[in-house]
């Protein structure tokens, strides 16, 4: 029904523009827009995904801080656990990245962030949760720091935006993470993850319109007429906007509470199950539905190869070498099978250490040990360049 529509032309496709406004408003309401501390001006747009939302938040923060402080050599501070989309944004927008090691709990090190702040700092990033380990950074402390120094704070809720608000309602001990926290200036939240909307739907939100206006590109001297675009894309698929709206309206509060309850419960069971497997340990104290684990007894990447042969697709992590599972509704009926296969895989590696034929363990292991990261980067580029 909406496949022919284009939100770029709001005057033509008014119904799609209204749907986008409602998706943004509903998402903002989940993330503190109704709280007095938010300031009551939360605004935003839909994007094609978490990476675009992050790119826009970084670009907007850069331009906003340039207008406020005249910063021309911008820097941003991120934890080493922050998503790689921030590195992409830094490359796109000529921003220096100051990457801070995580603390012993694998969280953003607030003291380390503070040491990196200088006259060129435009923003800091906190994750809720971070993609690698499923841990929520200390957003309140980062907010205090951002307020103290007058810089932007972006909270990456791409993964947690449609889980944490409902987990909190269900009684889980979720630390503050949204616009109710003083100092938070922008938030990215994917609707196409736990919001269960079609792929290609995310949102980027701002504390007020003064900040958000720096996201837009307005052109007045084009012979084609006056032009303004809110996001990275010009034309956008209205069908995805409608799909996101339909998903949110169909599920509603009760639907999201039900799905969140199921995946949170299974996530805790998986966490305990991994802890009970000899030779494995869970990294940190997962706040949500991502459970990362490593091993001091076996090569965890060899375990991953065997799990892959059994049909499980886990993410391989580094520093430390580890794996993670991102629990979804599909896992709720088969988590016991997952834990059994994982224990069997660990025992297989214990009994027969060494890479399996065709496995990726040697590649992951070698890449992690190579001191020349430039060479590793070149290998990644060559791999991507060969794809098409």
Task: Please tell me what each predicted stretch does.
Residues 57, 103-105, 118, 124-125, ...:
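Pyridoxal 5′-phosphate
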Residues 65-122:
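PLP-dependent aminotransferase-like
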Residues 108-154:
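Active-site phosphate-binding strand-loop segment of PLP-dependent enzymes
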Residues 1-17, 21-25, 29, 34-36, ...:
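Non-catalytic terminal extensions of PLP-dependent enzymes
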Residues 149, 154, 166-289, 293-298, ...:
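Active-site C-terminal subdomain of aminotransferase-like
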Residues 20, 24, 40-71, 85-89:
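Conserved beta-loop-alpha segment that forms the PLP phosphate-binding cup at the N-terminus of a helix
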Residues 39-41, 283-290, 318-322:
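Short Gly/Ser/Thr- and Asp/Glu-enriched loop/turn motifs at secondary-structure junctions
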């Amino acid at each position: 029904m909406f496949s022919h529509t284009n939100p770029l032309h709001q005057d033509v496709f008014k119904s799609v523009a209204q749907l986008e406004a409602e998706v943004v408003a509903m998402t903002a309401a989940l993330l503190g827009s109704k709280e007095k501390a938010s300031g009551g001006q939360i605004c935003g747009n839909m994007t094609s995904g978490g990476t675009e939302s992050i790119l826009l938040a970084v670009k907007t923060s850069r331009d906003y801080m340039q207008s406020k402080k005249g910063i021309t050599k911008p820097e941003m501070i991120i934890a080493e656990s922050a998503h790689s989309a921030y590195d992409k944004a830094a490359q796109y927008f000529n921003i220096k990245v100051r990457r801070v090691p995580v603390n012993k709990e694998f969280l953003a090190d607030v003291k380390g962030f503070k040491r990196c702040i200088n006259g060129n700092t435009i923003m800091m990033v906190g994750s809720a949760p971070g993609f690698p380990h499923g841990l929520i950074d200390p957003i309140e402390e980062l907010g205090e720091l951002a307020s103290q120094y007058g810089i932007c704070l972006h909270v990456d809720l791409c993964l947690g935006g449609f889980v944490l608000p409902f987990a909190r309602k269900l009684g889980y001990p979720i630390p503050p993470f949204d616009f109710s926290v003083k100092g938070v200036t922008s938030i990215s939240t994917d609707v196409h993850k736990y919001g269960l909307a079609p792929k290609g739907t995310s949102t980027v939100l701002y504390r007020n319109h003064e900040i958000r206006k720096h996201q837009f590109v307005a052109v007045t001297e084009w012979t084609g007429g006056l032009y303004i675009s809110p996001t990275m894309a010009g034309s956008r698929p209205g069908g995805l906007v409608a799909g996101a709206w339909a998903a949110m309206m169909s599920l509603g509060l009760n639907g999201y509470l039900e799905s969140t309850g199921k995946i949170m419960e299974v996530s805790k069971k998986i966490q305990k199950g991994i802890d009970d497997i000899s030779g494995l340990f869970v990294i940190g104290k997962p706040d949500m539905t991502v459970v990362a684990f490593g091993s001091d007894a076996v090569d965890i990447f060899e375990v991953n190869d065997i799990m892959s042969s059994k049909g499980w697709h886990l993410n391989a992590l580094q520093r430390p070498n580890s794996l993670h599972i991102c629990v979804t509704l599909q896992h709720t009926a088969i988590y016991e099978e997952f834990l059994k296969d994982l224990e069997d895989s660990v025992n297989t590696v214990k009994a027969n250490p060494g890479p399996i034929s065709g496995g990726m363990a040697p590649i992951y292991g070698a890449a992690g040990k190579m001191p020349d990261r430039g060479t590793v980067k070149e290998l990644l580029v060559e791999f991507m360049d060969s794809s098409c």
